[in-house]
Amino acid sequence: MARGGWRRLRRLLSAGQLLFQGRALLVTNTLGCGALMAAGDGVRQSWEIRARPGQVFDPRRSASMFAVGCSMGPFLHYWYLSLDRLFPASGLRGFPNVLKKVLVDQLVASPLLGVWYFLGLGCLEGQTVGESCQELREKFWEFYKADWCVWPAAQFVNFLFVPPQFRVTYINGLTLGWDTYLSYLKYRSPVPLTPPGCVALDTRAD
């Protein structure tokens, strides 16, 4: 039994390695991005359901997140390949190029993906272009500031230590919390503005 179990485990690991080679890697990265984005939305919806009695799970919302995530997967796949070609780096000797990769990633890919996220979801959910652009203007800088707080350190580790074929998978592994935040940013309820007169009345009532 023990020997048979080890053989099955080795076969399973060998089969898993195929997912990170050749054309299969593109599929793995694409589906991984979609699945993690949908999972992040699922986590966020679970929190909302607990906080707001009567709210039910919205599968269409998670499906939209999955679709947008899958659309980003090929871009990320080829983006990292391009960065490796432009700024080859191996170990600590490649430290200057690693810093260049992180900077280029933050200045180019991060804002592009932010625009992609809000406009893509807006399109899937029936928003007009004007509505999507208005939402982008309202939320983009909050997204981008949070991105700078999270991803430079993560990408530094990614470019310095993670083998190229595992880079998108590494990011996907870290991204569940980030995708939960993106779902919150996209779907949070707007805070109603209270007229000044109402504030004054409330204050007097206290």
Curated annotation (Swiss-Prot):
The membrane-topology field of this record reads: Multi-pass membrane protein
Q: Please give the positions of the paired cysteines in each disulfide bond.
A: none
**Main location group:** membrane
Record field: transmembrane: 20-42, 63-83, 102-122
Q: Which GO terms describe its cellular component?
A: cytoplasm; mitochondrial inner membrane; mitochondrion
Family assignment from sequence similarity: Belongs to the peroxisomal membrane protein PXMP2/4 family.
Q: What does this protein do?
A: Required for the assembly and stability of the mitochondrial ribosome. Is a positive regulator of mitochondrial protein synthesis.
Protein's name according to its UniProt entry: Mpv17-like protein 2
Organism per entry: Homo sapiens
What is this organism's lineage?
Eukaryota, Metazoa, Chordata, Craniata, Vertebrata
Q: Which gene encodes it?
A: MPV17L2
